[in-house]
Amino acid sequence: MTLNRRKYLTGMLALGLGLSLASAAHAITVKDDQGELTLDKVPTRIVALEFSFVDALANVGISPVGVADDNQPSRVIQPVRDLIRPWTSVGTRSQPNMESIAALKPDLIIADSSRHRAAYGQLSKIAPVLLLNSRYGSYNDILKQDQTIGDVVGKSTEMQARISQLQAKVKDIAKEIPDGQTAMYGSSRENTLDVHTQGTFAGSLLAALGFKVPQAEGG
């Protein structure tokens, strides 16, 4: 075997080892509402089935290729739209379109454990699914989920920095609110009124700001 051939083979082996080590370095296992999810590389084609997931991705400079935007791109608020590239609509959050999702060839789908659990089997045939509790998550739940998303997309440090900024802002606002104030957040539809207690995102955020927030019955 010639010296040049030995150098070539040695180089190819080193390259192969380097790629294997790089792949292993990107491998990650995270806990979600389905148990655990393991990915062997950082996903680059992500479909987000809730607005909060789009928000989390945008905060660390990641643009999803597909969004369940209820067929109305404007449902994604302007400050978030300003941070991401145009996406393909994959239907509504309550009924995402499986064909539209599959056509995008995603390498990760981020879904809600309440709204999309029944569709988990179908979704997981398309791509790995990260199942998180966005719809009924509290303020602290959402922060933890955002960090999980940051970990999965290889932006752990950036996400922690964004979360720290938000927590600092909440503390600053809380200092301006007099002690002993009570607050309740409600949302209304044509025939219903929903009250957001401490266990909800809005209610728990108000509590983090220092307000007294009613608990749910039995809570």
Feature annotation, model-predicted:
Residues 51-100:
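A short, structured surface patch at a secondary-structure boundary
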